[in-house]
Curated annotation (Swiss-Prot):
This is Very-long-chain (3R)-3-hydroxyacyl-CoA dehydratase 2. Keywords: Acetylation, Endoplasmic reticulum, Fatty acid biosynthesis, Fatty acid metabolism, Glycoprotein, Lipid biosynthesis, Lipid metabolism, Lyase, Membrane, Transmembrane, Transmembrane helix. It comes from Mus musculus (Mouse). May interact with enzymes of the ELO family (including ELOVL1); with those enzymes that mediate condensation, the first of the four steps of the reaction cycle responsible for fatty acids elongation, may be part of a larger fatty acids elongase complex. Interacts with BCAP31. Interacts with TECR. Pfam families: PTPLA (PF04387). It is found in: Endoplasmic reticulum membrane. It catalyses: a very-long-chain (3R)-3-hydroxyacyl-CoA = a very-long-chain (2E)-enoyl-CoA + H2O; (3R)-hydroxyhexadecanoyl-CoA = (2E)-hexadecenoyl-CoA + H2O; (3R)-hydroxyoctadecanoyl-CoA = (2E)-octadecenoyl-CoA + H2O; (3R)-hydroxyeicosanoyl-CoA = (2E)-eicosenoyl-CoA + H2O.
Length: 254
């Protein structure tokens, strides 16, 4: 579940649309890119997703200017947030049919972790929707996704501005911890309401002889951040050094 905030930075190594140009300098990958029809589709997909997250960003700014407060801004962008984040499920299909050379399993984990947070936590536990922690991860996701989908679009067009590449491999240093903090605080805020309502929990006895405690499940998800966060974060730091140093070396030779 820690991948929910790391998606933007880790997906470039496998998991979304336009992964061919996601910072990998492997000549083999570039030669084995998608065909013209698939490339055109991926460009359109990434342009639409970039525009969608820009709509969310503009919605946040407009709501803030209208209210004069950052509290409860979630309600102003709830629908587009759900729509475009759920739209990322197509990225799993892209990997499954082979137009993007990424792991279906890894991509599924990354995408579903965010979809889970949006629908199974924020949507299902309405009491947390006014929490500032929701705004924290929404802002982190919004900036991240605008950069990520822009990165994929320009990469597919073989015209990637350095500023976008730099932003993709630099801003996560702040955005990843910011997103993770927002996610954890949101899940934590949901716990008492989940327990009180028995949300998504299954008690014994029942004909299937099966029980499930959603409250305990959310706690396990929070605990999973402890080993996953540092591993993913330092992996991304390593990727940043590798990708940006390679770019600088390439510029010197030019």
């Amino acid at each position: 579940m820690a991948a929910a905030a790391a998606t933007a930075a880790t997906k470039g190594n496998g998991g979304g649309s336009g992964r061919v140009g996601a910072g990998d300098s492997s000549g083999a990958r570039k030669k084995k890119g998608p065909g013209p029809v698939a490339t055109a589709y991926l460009v359109i997909y990434n342009v639409v997703m970039t525009a969608g997250w820009l709509v969310i960003a503009v919605g946040l700014v407009r709501a803030y200017l209208a209210k004069g407060s950052y509290h409860s801004l979630y309600y102003s962008i709830e629908r587009p947030l759900k729509f475009f984040q759920t739209g990322a499920l197509l990225e799993i299909l892209h990997c499954a049919i082979g137009i993007v050379p990424s792991s279906v399993v890894l991509t599924s984990f990354q995408v579903m972790s965010r979809v889970f947070l949006i629908w199974a936590v924020t949507h299902s536990v309405k009491e947390v929707q006014s929490e500032d922690s929701v705004l924290l991860f929404v802002i982190a996701w919004t900036i991240t996704e605008i950069i990520r989908y822009s990165f994929y679009t320009f990469s597919l067009l073989n015209h990637l501005p350095y500023i976008i590449k730099w932003a993709r491999y630099t801003l996560f240093i702040v955005l990843y911890p910011m997103g993770v903090t927002g996610e954890l605080l949101t899940i934590y805020a949901a716990l008492p309401f989940v327990r009180q309502a028995g949300l998504y929990s299954i008690s014994l006895p029942n004909k299937y002889n099966f029980s499930f405690d959603y409250h305990a499940f959310l706690i396990l998800i929070m605990i999973s951040y402890i080993p996953l966060f540092p591993q993913l974060y330092f992996h991304m730091i390593h990727q940043r050094r590798k990708v940006l140093s390679h770019t600088e070396e390439h510029k010197k030779f030019e």
